[in-house]
């Protein structure tokens, strides 16, 4: 059977009423007959959600897949990856299970596809009063555009105009990716190993994915001049914070040495899956232990780029390779002797004893 052009991946958790509205809006998409499939990726809801999706699947002409696993807190990155792993479309259109699609939404995203680009959108936030009155059977007859606050349309227009300027100036981190409405080529999502599952709790997994897509050479363009989705009101997630800098994931997000292909994504990447830049000087106990721990890992030549470049102090090596992460290993007691020129170039500095094999192995499995 021919693969679909696009896989709609809808994440959800314990919001069956909202999900029913989203499913109803997907059922009335126009201009895309036979071109899409739906994957509902659930984060451990009760059986009401499973029954809702099962009943919905019986009445629609497109494939519907449901996946779930036990709930262990807010794990949006993991849920999206589980959905992506089951998707067969050339394009992955990620959607939130609380945001209703306009009838031409999927067709608009398909028409906007370009190699090397991801299309990013946003939501119009519907007021509680409007959200409360929405019912699945009545969506086709409702003009959500008219019911949305004018201030929301003004906000989206400003965001779109800013995104055009940011792309023109080749801004390194903007426009930002909003995970509830974005489309990416499947092979590009695979290139960065999907979403980073080390983000647990609310926030920053979208920003991280956007940065890593850019690191892989993929550009992000706004689609807000063509389409958006409509967010149905609900109370905020308990792990959300009023200020993003107070979020539980912020320290991890702001770390230096981010790898384009994350270590805990669609596939786990152990130390033997990373391209390392290893020191040539192996005369110290710590440098010899490092070589032994990475004996089966791929290594880059001194003039080749790598993912993680490692310098051991004391030692004769310096950071010379082009690398995404620079790791400085300092033997215990020698940190003060390490030149500041080496320390400044390092993204991460760790002090270890020359015989601490367990500590070094643990570090090599998670750095980056």
Give the label of every model feature segment.
Residues 42-51, 99, 333-334:
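A conserved acidic beta->alpha catalytic loop
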Residues 5-7, 37, 208:
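Cell-envelope/extracellular polymer assembly enzymes that use nucleotide-activated donors
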Residues 176-177, 181-193, 200-219, 224-225:
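A short, conserved alpha-helix in the catalytic core of glycosyltransferases
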Residues 70-87:
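Glycine-rich, basic loop-to-helix element that forms the pyrophosphate-binding segment
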Residues 34-47, 65-69:
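Short beta-strand/loop segment that forms part of the nucleotide-sugar
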Residues 92:
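Short aromatic/hydrophobic "clamp" motif used to bind/position activated sugar donors
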Residues 104-149:
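Conserved donor NDP-sugar-binding/catalytic core segment of glycosyltransferases
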Residues 24-35:
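Short, acidic, metal-binding catalytic loop of nucleotide-sugar glycosyltransferases
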